[in-house]
């Protein structure tokens, strides 16, 4: 007897052979223990992409996670070229006023050039 497509692939109700061959997800055993009623599990799909920045090859075929500092250095512009020390501006005190003013790099250079005072 031939089955029509509507009978064979009834989307409204699962067929008995489908129901018997695949147990429901909430009854499947889980590696972490049994699940209670109403709990669902989900797994994230993971790719083996070599462009991932969250892990590196450990040299023995396995993977290891990168330290947070290393990840941050990769994301910063200019790479991990070196450490920044000090500030761009300097605080100086004038003899007359006694107040502090910040000078930028350009102002310091202009002060050192002859004929600019």
From Swiss-Prot:
PROSITE patterns: DEHYDRIN_1 (PS00315), DEHYDRIN_2 (PS00823). Induction: By desiccation (leaves) and by abscisic acid (ABA) (leaves and callus). Keywords: Stress response. InterPro entries: Dehydrin, Dehydrin_CS. Residues 1-117 are annotated as: Disordered. One of its GO terms (cellular component) is cytosol. Belongs to the plant dehydrin family. This is Desiccation-related protein clone PCC27-04. The lineage of its organism: Eukaryota, Viridiplantae, Streptophyta, Embryophyta, Tracheophyta.
């Amino acid at each position: 007897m031939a089955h029509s497509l509507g009978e064979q692939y009834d989307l409204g109700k699962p067929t008995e052979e489908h129901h018997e061959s695949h147990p429901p997800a909430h009854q499947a055993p889980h590696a972490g223990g049994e699940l209670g009623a109403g709990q669902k599990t989900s797994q994230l799909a993971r790719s083996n992409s070599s462009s991932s920045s969250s892990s590196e090859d450990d040299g023995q075929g396995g993977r290891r996670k990168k330290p947070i500092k290393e990840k941050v250095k990769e994301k910063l512009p200019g790479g991990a070229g070196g450490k920044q020390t000090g500030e761009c501006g300097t605080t100086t005190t004038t003899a007359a006023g006694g107040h502090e003013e910040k000078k930028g790099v350009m102002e310091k250079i202009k002060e050192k050039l002859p004929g600019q005072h």
